[in-house]
Amino acid sequence: LCLTLAKLVRYRTVPLLICFMALSAFLAMFIDSITVVLFLATVTLELAQTMKFDPVPMILSEIFCANLGGAATMCGDPPNIIIGTSLGYSFFDFIENTGAVVAICFVLILIYFMLCFRKELEHAEKANGGPVTCPAPATAITNKKAFLASAAVFLLAVILLVTHAQTELTVACIGVIVAILTLIVLGLTSGKKSVIEVIKGVDYKTLLFFTGLFVSVAGLEKTGVLNVIANFITKVSGGSAAVIVVIILWVSAVTSAFVDNIPFAATMIPVIRAIAAAEGMDIGVLAWALSLGTDLGGNATPIGASANVVGTSASAKGGYPIGWGRYCKYCVPATLIVMAVSTAYLFLRYL
């Protein structure tokens, strides 16, 4: 897909930047942002080697847009899955609420990164000058049967996620169905060894971490610790709904820039429940503030989200290390832009 896009834009760097940003945001709406960034960064490094340009601007843009696109849907980023399943929101609830502001932010970020990197990429393109020879898109597919079958399973997963409110299938149930189908398809098209390798590759440590995390959060809720936090936020805000929303949005963003947003989101669910009950507020606006804060705030630093770590690591392995200075130089202003837009959006639509 990436090589096809590169061929369509005739291997011009600026159109390629736009295409990869759009592709990153779109795919992250349905696929884990880590996976999206990993394969986009890999392809970008390959194209950079052939086309003789610095891949860092493109990789930074891809990372940012993956986190941005993931904020638009329930299945895009882990915090959204936690928020959606805990509070009973559907795929379309997220599209209608967070998806709208993400679309606005994407347009602004597209313009921002183009202004930041256009001259640099155009200069590299002119300096290279000569004809570009890249591998044919078809050569990337080594097993056509497995490719077609996997694409069909992916399409089914998207359909099930979009219609889960109508079918009453939970996100967890859909995940199990898709995982089983993937293993069956892999076994039929690639053999038993491939299935065993995939099962061995499952991150069981992370699964155990999540189990322990939710047990800990339940313990904090039962002992009243989270109610204390909720009461503190209410007291600081003076009972103002607008101030409460701003606190949740910006505290979530700043925290997620330095701390993993998954445990933070899980911890904050009971907190926003308690605030909504105490102040008689619609929990929806608090949920969308939490979602946008945790998803978008992580873009600010190289460690703010797992996709950031994966993208910068891939770039470093390819010979293009991205330091904190260069990362924050471009991504902190971009994060402030999307957070300002999110604040205005929440005020205009809900308050």
Where are these regions (language model features)?
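Hydrophobic alpha-helical transmembrane segments
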Residues: 14-22, 36, 59-60, 95-99, ...
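Alpha-helical transmembrane segments of multi-pass membrane proteins
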Residues: 13-25, 52-71, 103, 241-255, ...
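Membrane-embedded alpha-helical segments and adjacent helix-loop junctions characteristic
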Residues: 1-54, 209-279
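Transmembrane alpha-helical segments of multi-pass membrane transport proteins and ion-pumping complexes
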Residues: 12, 16, 25, 29, ...
